[in-house]
Amino acid sequence: MTALSRLAATVEARKGADPESSWTAKLFAKGPEKCAEKFGEEAVEAIIAAVKNDRANLVYEAADVLYHLTVMLAARDVSLDEVLAELDRRAGTSGIAEKAARG
């Protein structure tokens, strides 16, 4: 099991937890919109770290992005496996061809 798979399993397990006992459960209790907002905030922080060429902070913020992406997906009942299957589907297809196929 990869670190990302373990993270997804832990996040999923927190869905029904007491919001006072878990940060993840607290995010779920605030609703999917708040989960999406937190993902956006963390993405911006990662972008800033990248623009500033702050490697250590970029690694830190990228981990936050992955965590909050996982929470946001779970809040909308989208599994990590679904996202990975989409990546597998796209494998071997150029980005240009994939974008053109979307219209």
Curated annotation (Swiss-Prot):
GO terms for molecular function: ATP binding; phosphoribosyl-ATP diphosphatase activity. It comes from the Bacteria. Transmembrane segments: none annotated. NCBIfam families: histidine_hisI (TIGR03188), PRK00400.1-3 (NF001611), PRK00400.1-5 (NF001613). This is Phosphoribosyl-ATP pyrophosphatase. Its main location: cytoplasm. It is found in: Cytoplasm. GO terms for biological process: L-histidine biosynthetic process. Belongs to the PRA-PH family. Its EC number is 3.6.1.31. Gene3D superfamilies: MazG-like. Keywords: Amino-acid biosynthesis, ATP-binding, Cytoplasm, Histidine biosynthesis, Hydrolase, Nucleotide-binding. It comes from Rhodobacter capsulatus (strain ATCC BAA-309 / NBRC 16581 / SB1003). One of its GO terms (cellular component) is cytoplasm. It is an enzyme of class 3 (hydrolase). The gene is hisE. SUPFAM superfamilies: all-alpha NTP pyrophosphatases. Pathway: Amino-acid biosynthesis; L-histidine biosynthesis; L-histidine from 5-phospho-alpha-D-ribose 1-diphosphate: step 2/9. It catalyses: 1-(5-phospho-beta-D-ribosyl)-ATP + H2O = 1-(5-phospho-beta-D-ribosyl)-5'-AMP + diphosphate + H(+).
